Regions:
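Helix-loop boundary and gating motifs at the non-cytosolic
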Residues: 1-41, 200-237, 241, 247-251
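Substrate-agnostic recognition of the 12-TM MFS/MFS-like secondary transporter fold
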Residues: 1-11, 32-47, 64-65, 87-148, ...
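Structural signature of the two symmetry-related core transmembrane helices
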Residues: 59-73, 277-292, 372
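Helix-loop junctions at membrane interfaces in 12-TM secondary transporters
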Residues: 75-88, 294-305
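C-terminal membrane-cytosol helix-exit motif in multi-pass small-molecule transporters
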Residues: 162-180, 378-386
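Juxtamembrane intracellular "pre-TM" segments in multi-pass secondary transporters
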Residues: 177-206, 232-239, 398-404
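C-terminal transmembrane helical hairpin of 12-TM major facilitator-type secondary transporters
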Residues: 276-317
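Intrinsic disorder in cytosolic terminal tails and internal cytosolic loops
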Residues: 386-404
Length: 404
């Protein structure tokens, strides 16, 4: 439940506050959108340090979440524009740094043949909480005001996010988790050696970098497209008033409602299907949803695009979170995930700045076509790994154990 509430923060509400309350410029908004990148890039360092300290993955994730809770608690008490940016950067860094540890917990507790099914089943709780909370919070933020601006600084929202992280910290501390083994080394970025030594892993990451940039470049612009539409009046005009409630409906409730339906399907397909075919199908839905979203000015068109995004994102979350468990040696899952997150951090940092810069130069509709083209091209390159995907689907080992 806590992760669903926090999902609405990082995908919608923090940027909404940046646009409609603080009225930040493009650089500040891109910084907030890219805030989690640092935590991703620090993944190898976190894994190395946790192994060195002898903590279990659950203990480490709990402490990181508790630190993020403290950041949001501070933001609930102080309404300062620069403290807001700094607090968001630190909170998201701590939150995303825990991801490789959580993936290792999945590896240890979910059987390989049913990992996708179990992941998608537990994700249902998160999806319901995200959809419900997103719609409710959007309605409260609108506050009966027909204008497009927030009526006041939503300190209560920051307090809820702090509570969600605190609850996540408690839950992590109670999870069955083990200490990391085989990850101690001479330097904290030692895990990056797997990028060099594992050819298939390297090719997947390169393709993922390209279609990830195509997707992430436009991801934060969805909030900008709706909440700051007046700044782009020469390019498009929305046929409705984008209040916080309607923005939450389009960007939070509809995608999550669709995810609730499709998440079990993608979870089962992840366990049974060729991974590369699955990833390409998901990328097709991402590309279509982006093009439709940024070519729509009506509520109907945007809602359809949001639904297609929900279809893609429901499977994308399973694939993104668990794919390394298919290709990495069991004891190196956290290492492989930390490398995946390191490169994810690079594209998470680059993409928002690139997107906010380009939308000032070309219409969002044209930018969506460029992104879709990048997604399709890199997906075709990824599909060249089809034979390897068949071996994984049949349960054959692809990666030899690499000596420590």
């Amino acid at each position: 439940m806590a992760s669903g509430i926090l999902e609405t923060a990082f995908t919608t509400f923090l940027l909404l506050i940046a646009v409609q309350w603080f009225e930040f410029g493009a650089t500040a908004k891109a910084t907030i959108a890219a805030a989690g990148a640092l935590g991703f890039m620090l993944g190898p360092v976190v894994v190395s340090k946790v192994a060195e300290l002898g903590w279990t993955t659950g203990q480490a994730a709990s402490r990181l979440a508790l630190g993020a809770a403290g950041c949001f608690a501070l933001l609930s008490a102080v309404s300062d524009r620069w403290l807001f940016i700094g607090g968001i950067i630190l909170a998201t860094t701590l939150g995303t740094a825990a991801i490789p540890l959580v993936t290792q917990i999945y590896q240890e507790n979910y059987p390989s043949r049913k990992r996708g099914k179990y992941f998608s089943s537990t994700a249902m709780i998160r999806i319901v909480s995200a959809a419900t909370f997103g719609l409710l919070a959007g309605w409260i933020l609108t506050n009966g005001d027909s204008s497009q601006k927030l009526a006041s600084y939503p300190w209560w929202l920051m307090l809820i996010f702090a509570s969600a992280f605190a609850w996540a910290s408690f839950c992590f501390s109670k999870l069955p988790a083990k200490k990391l083994t085989g990850t101690k080394g001479t330097h904290p970025f030692r895990s990056l050696r797997f990028f060099k030594e594992d050819k298939l892993f390297r090719h997947i990451l390169i393709c993922w970098m390209l279609f990830g940039i195509g997707n992430l470049m436009l991801f934060p612009l969805r909030v900008e497209y709706l909440a700051n539409s007046g700044a782009y009046a020469d390019d498009y005009t929305l046929s409705f008033k984008p209040t916080p409630a309607t923005i939450a409906l389009i960007l939070v409730f509809i995608p999550n409602a669709v995810k609730l339906i499709f998440s079990p399907l993608w979870g089962n397909l992840f366990d049974k299907m060729n991974f590369f075919v699955l990833r390409v199908i998901l990328n097709f839905f991402f590309a279509v949803s982006l093009v439709l979203f940024f070519h729509s000015t009506s509520m109907v068109g945007l809602c359809i695009a949001a639904g297609l995004f929900g279809v893609a994102n429901s499977g994308g979350e399973v694939a993104w979170s668990l794919w390394v468990t298919k290709f990495a040696p069991a004891k190196h899952v956290a290492d492989y995930m930390s490398v995946h997150l390191f490169f994810n951090g690079i594209r998470n940092f680059i993409s928002p700045f690139l997107g906010f810069w380009l939308i000032g130069l070309i219409p969002a509709s044209n930018l969506s076509l460029f992104s879709a083209g990048l997604i399709v091209a890199s997906s075709l390159a990824l599909l060249s790994n089809y034979p390897s995907g068949e071996k994984v689907r049949r349960g054959a080992a692809l990666t030899e154990e690499i000596s420590d």
